[in-house]
Amino acid sequence: MAEKVAVLLGGTSAEREVSLLSGQAVLAGLKEAGIDAYGVDTKDFPVTQLKEQGFDKVFIALHGRGGEDGTLQGVLEFLQLPYTGSGVMASALTMDKLRTKLVWQALGLPISPYVALNRQQFETLSPEELVACVAKLGLPLIVKPSHEGSSVGMSKVDHASELQKALVEAFQHDSDVLIEKWLSGPEFTVAILGDEVLPSIRIQPPGVFYDYDAKYLSDKTQYFCPSGLSDESEQQLAALALQAYHALDCSGWGRVDVMQDRDGHFYLLEVNTSPGMTSHSLVPMAARQYGLSFSQLVARILMLAD
């Protein structure tokens, strides 16, 4: 009998709208590949009932909290339902940008200099103390919530007077915030499928950085795949991405985001364990360059589910 596959989409995180788009695309791709797949919006459907509804396998197309932070993965482990992407620990770890950095730092992998602040510290420090706290990083800075995806709550800080406002914005989304040294070079992303590294993509957003609008709404964001790197740099980037991915115990598929500075050095940003699969998304773009159609890509991801 053919496997019955649930494509989990929507959900309740700040990335719900993106997840709905990803899920519908995945669903169409799986059906095109001849797979018996059904869309399930977890906002309306309790995942604990998946097995009794006859589902044999789960394709996770949820983004953000509750979908790629280990919570859902734990439920699916308990239900003994195979699912796409990373397991509980890797999903939880990669959703936490601070702890991801701590692991990479311990292994000597390149990351941008940063300062971490929690809400209590933020509320007790004066504006002058905050500025002193990040003085060692130098301006400009990027401020981001530790647990949000899709660039939600992120701000660039060009002047010390802007730091307070950027932190207030970030703390609206999280109780832990990262302040990082701004890297002015290009951004790259590297998709990983199983243990295969797909061609890198160079991202050129229309604005200051690759924010939510640039990722999902703008038609002015430019993507270059092949990325234009030399063969040597492409191999170096691929090796770094795979090392960073395995350091966090990721599996199945994912995407590693990287910045390059003016001297050509790469710095790790984060890993996405349930990347976007919309018309603007990067993994399908890299897969096309690799020779995989969208339906072949989603079928391969599903095949890697365990």
UniProtKB/Swiss-Prot annotation:
Question: Is the Nucleotidyltransferase keyword given for this protein?
Answer: no
Write down the EC number.
6.3.2.4
Record bears the keyword Lipid biosynthesis: no
Q: Where does ATP bind?
A: 134-189
Task: Cite the binding residues for Mg(2+) 2.
Answer: 270, 272
**Which cofactors, if any, are listed as required?**
Mg(2+); Mn(2+)
Output the InterPro entries linked to this UniProt entry. Answer: ATP-grasp, ATP_grasp_subdomain_1, D-Ala_lig_Van_CS, D_ala_D_ala, Dala_Dala_lig_C, Dala_Dala_lig_N, PreATP-grasp_dom_sf
**Principal EC category:** ligase
Give the record's GO biological process terms: cell wall organization; peptidoglycan biosynthetic process; regulation of cell shape
Q: Where is the ATP-grasp domain?
A: 101-303
What are the subcellular locations of this protein? Cytoplasm
Cofactor note text: Binds 2 magnesium or manganese ions per subunit.
Main localization, broad class: cytoplasm
Q: Which Pfam families match?
A: Dala_Dala_lig_C, Dala_Dala_lig_N
What residues bind Mg(2+) 1, as annotated?
A: 257, 270
Q: Which cellular component appears as one GO term in the record?
A: cytosol
Q: Which pathway is recorded for this entry?
A: Cell wall biogenesis; peptidoglycan biosynthesis
Catalytic activity from the UniProt record: 2 D-alanine + ATP = D-alanyl-D-alanine + ADP + phosphate + H(+)
Lineage: superkingdom: Bacteria
Q: What does this gene product do?
A: Cell wall formation.
Which family does this protein fall into?
Answer: Belongs to the D-alanine--D-alanine ligase family.
Which protein, by its recorded name, is this?
D-alanine--D-alanine ligase
Taxonomic source organism? Yersinia pestis
Q: What broad taxonomic lineage does this protein's source fall under?
A: Bacteria, Pseudomonadati, Pseudomonadota, Gammaproteobacteria, Enterobacterales
Primary gene name: ddl
